[in-house]
Amino acid sequence: LLVAGDGRAALRLGAGLHLPERPTPGLLAFLRARRPGALLSLAVHGRRGLFRGRALRADAVLISPIFATQSHPGARPLGPHGWAWLARNAGRPAVALGGVDGRSQGRVPAQAAGVAAVGWLGG
């Protein structure tokens, strides 16, 4: 279980933490100090995010959006090839996020460590 952006909630739940691409440094320090070894993931939307993921020593990156998504209607999709390039250069497990549903999941590159979804629950 990963909690998005709320270190205190992550601690209460004994969960890991998912940070936006531009995380709050104090939040990361809070989580690391209180719960060493807690799973940390970082949102990545482009090359800059890859550098941040390395600097933060994130356990995994959620690269998005791979496809058009209703949760971020103005975001330009990376597409499978753009997503795969970022994943190859991430240096850590990469999870596909954004527009993943029953129709698109088969187009997610095989190197994905997994898929994540905001609105899709398998239907």
Model-derived features with residue positions:
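Glycine-rich adenosine-cofactor-binding loop
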Residues: G79-G82, A87, G91-S104, V108, ...
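Amphipathic, non-transmembrane alpha-helical secondary structure
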Residues: R8-L11, R47-F51, A55, P80, ...
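Short, conserved glycine- and acidic-residue-centered signature motifs
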Residues: A43, R76-G79
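Structural motif
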Residues: R12-L13, L56, N89, A110-A113
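Glycine-rich phosphate-binding active-site loops on the catalytic face of alpha/beta enzymes
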Residues: G7, E21-L31, A60-G74, G99-G123
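Catalytic beta/alpha-barrel core
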Residues: L1-G53, L62-S64, A96
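A short, structure-level motif marking secondary-structure boundaries and short turns
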Residues: R34-P36, A68-T69, N89-A90
